[in-house]
């Protein structure tokens, strides 16, 4: 297994699919990385040379991925909560943030049902 950005990349999958195992790299970004490095997106990781894998590492290193991206997202959510804006309040209360209905549904965000005490 090749290791890129601290993630073990599967050898037996296509390059584009393997790169999506990195947090912050989706299909579109993976295709852009392959185009920038000149690596065939349909080639499997085990068939790539060490030089090509180094090129992929270099391109991925230019992006914000893994721990840095997770930290950045958490800091943005924390900033909203500190501001006290509507989105921050929804995050703080553990409710849907983007305007979804909550009378029914929203169980994933709200958690399991709590019994009504009489």
Curated annotation (Swiss-Prot):
Question: According to its UniProt record, what is one Pfam family this protein matches?
Answer: Ribosomal_S13
Q: Name one GO biological process term.
A: translation
What Gene Ontology molecular-function terms does this entry list?
rRNA binding; structural constituent of ribosome; tRNA binding
**Record region (Disordered):** 93-118
Family, as annotated: Belongs to the universal ribosomal protein uS13 family.
What does the record give as the function of this protein?
Located at the top of the head of the 30S subunit, it contacts several helices of the 16S rRNA. In the 70S ribosome it contacts the 23S rRNA (bridge B1a) and protein L5 of the 50S subunit (bridge B1b), connecting the 2 subunits; these bridges are implicated in subunit movement. Contacts the tRNAs in the A and P-sites.
Subunit structure of this chain's protein: Part of the 30S ribosomal subunit. Forms a loose heterodimer with protein S19. Forms two bridges to the 50S subunit in the 70S ribosome.
What is the name listed in the Swiss-Prot or TrEMBL entry for this protein?
Small ribosomal subunit protein uS13
């Amino acid at each position: 297994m090749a290791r890129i950005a601290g993630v073990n990349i599967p050898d037996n999958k296509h390059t584009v699919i393997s790169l999506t195992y990195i947090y912050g790299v989706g299909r579109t970004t993976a295709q852009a990385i392959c185009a920038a490095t000149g690596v065939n997106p349909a080639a499997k990781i085990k068939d790539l040379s060490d030089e090509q894998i180094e090129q992929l590492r270099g391109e991925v290193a230019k992006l914000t991925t893994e721990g840095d991206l997770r930290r950045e997202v958490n800091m943005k959510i924390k900033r909203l909560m500190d501001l006290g804006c509507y989105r921050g309040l929804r995050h703080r209360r553990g409710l849907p943030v983007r305007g979804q209905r909550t009378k029914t549904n929203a169980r994933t965000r709200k958690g399991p049902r709590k019994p009504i005490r009489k």
